[in-house]
Design a protein with these regions (language model features):
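Non-catalytic interaction/Regulatory regions outside core domains
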Residues: 1-152
Length: 152
């Protein structure tokens, strides 16, 4: 799914991060440049820090880091021929998609957002299906244990 996303959106690299551990749980099939991974991980740290300082809701409760959270940051240290932009979108409360995009492609942000929304929908369906399979398996195990208990 990430390969389709990056090819359709002209994204250079995409990471799906666990926001809490800042470890990527998925990436596209292209090789991982550790410098890119580190800068993407640091972006999550920065956003969490800023959210904790400025993002508390009016009731003083939860964080404002939600499904509408996103960030676009231009990297100044990048190669002059390679104007890279970091783009973060929250997938759910525990996952964030962080992409490296050529600055010339960010003008098509509406297309990128549309494709990311489709990616999020696909990921949600996978998680729901996985949950259904896990629940069915757990029910089968419970029935099996009950039957075994009756035999004893």
């Amino acid at each position: 799914m990430l390969d389709t996303l990056i090819s359709r959106s002209k994204i250079q690299k995409a990471f799906l991060f666990d926001v809490i551990s800042k470890i990527y749980i998925a990436t596209d099939s292209y090789p991982v440049n550790m410098q890119h991974y580190e800068i993407c991980s640091e972006l999550i740290d920065v956003l969490i820090d800023v959210t904790q300082i400025y993002g508390v809701d009016e009731e003083g409760g939860g964080s404002k880091f939600d499904k509408k959270s996103s960030s676009i940051i231009r990297l100044n240290h990048a190669n002059p021929q390679e104007n890279i932009v970091l783009y973060l979108r929250e997938v759910d409360k525990c996952l964030a998609l962080v992409c490296l995009i050529n600055e010339s492609e960010i003008t098509k942000q509406h297309l990128i957002n549309y494709n990311i929304d489709r990616f999020k929908e696909g990921l949600k369906k996978i998680f729901e299906h996985s949950h259904e399979i896990t629940s069915a398996h757990q029910q089968q195990q419970a029935v099996k244990q009950q039957e075994e208990a009756k035999l004893l």
